[in-house]
Amino acid sequence: MSVFIDKNTKVMVQGITGSTALFHTKQMLDYGTKIVAGVTPGKGGQVVEGVPVFNTVEEAKNETGATVSVIYVPAPFAADSILEAADADLDMVICITEHIPVLDMVKVKRYLQGRKTRLVGPNCPGVITADECKIGIMPGYIHKKGHVGVVSRSGTLTYEAVHQLTEEGIGQTTAVGIGGDPVNGTNFIDVLKAFNEDDETKAVVMIGEIGGTAEEEAAEWIKANMTKPVVGFIGGQTAPPGKRMGHAGAIISGGKGTAEEKIKTLNSCGVKTAATPSEIGSTLIEAAKEAGIYESLLTVNK
């Protein structure tokens, strides 16, 4: 099993005729992802990379049966694209776009309340179920099928963690990039719940960063509910207060959201943390050995 997506997931690409979307559509198709439709208003009837283009999400869904959308639409128009996908009742929308205005996302979040559409992102690398379905911008080749779930606020740190696991012979179920913006859709707890309920996932890597309280809330949830080992890493340990570090949400303000605070909370809730990015893989191995599941995680031929 996997979480959120699998080899049967039918995907549409919003903004497919843009150069970034075209590049990544080809990469996703090469990975084996079932991309059945693209959406660009005014470009309906075209075919790009063998994928039919429609004017609206509703039309694309009705014609192809797509249930998931990935958005590469420029920031000023991305919020409207999310709302259009929600209006079409898609199961999930994965928004890659960065620099969406915060107020736009506040409106989107409010609009999605009570609706069935799950939003992942924005400003995220996407979601990948190893060897089955890649939706987003992550490098597919580093991901190998196995039993470790990965959830992260950072794209590049996700790739680093996955690469280390694969090099150690440890495959993954699904890797979910929840995005680095202050207002996003799916959060750590949503993904941890999914991993906790997934029979194939035996351990989890959670990568956070400075800013906000999402990691602390996740730590408390892990302590109360998680039945599988979780290891963590917090980015931004050397960040000065008030200085934004890369992501819009990665800022320490009012003395809250420091790496030190997050690490302390995670450790007190039973989550082992890696001191540096290069130790994420070895920290997972240590936790797996303590839990007696290390051998069962070795699914990749090195």
From Swiss-Prot:
GO MF term set: nucleotide binding; succinate-CoA ligase (ADP-forming) activity; succinate-CoA ligase (GDP-forming) activity
Keyword Ribonucleoprotein among record annotations: no
Positions that bind substrate: 159
Pathway(s) of this molecule: Carbohydrate metabolism; tricarboxylic acid cycle; succinate from succinyl-CoA (ligase route): step 1/1
GO terms of biological process kind: tricarboxylic acid cycle
Active site positions, chain numbering: 247 (tele-phosphohistidine intermediate)
Enzyme class: ligase
Disulfide bond residue pairs: none
InterPro entries documented for this protein: Cit_synth/succinyl-CoA_lig_AS, Citrt_syn/SCS-alpha_CS, CoA-bd, CoA_lig_alpha, NAD(P)-bd_dom_sf, SUCC_ACL_C, Succinyl-CoA_synth-like
HAMAP family tied to this protein: Succ_CoA_alpha
Function: Succinyl-CoA synthetase functions in the citric acid cycle (TCA), coupling the hydrolysis of succinyl-CoA to the synthesis of either ATP or GTP and thus represents the only step of substrate-level phosphorylation in the TCA. The alpha subunit of the enzyme binds the substrates coenzyme A and phosphate, while succinate binding and nucleotide specificity is provided by the beta subunit.
NCBIfam families assigned: PRK05678.1, sucCoAalpha
The protein, known as: Succinate--CoA ligase [ADP-forming] subunit alpha
Lineage of origin: Bacteria, Bacillati, Bacillota, Bacilli, Bacillales
Primary gene name: sucD
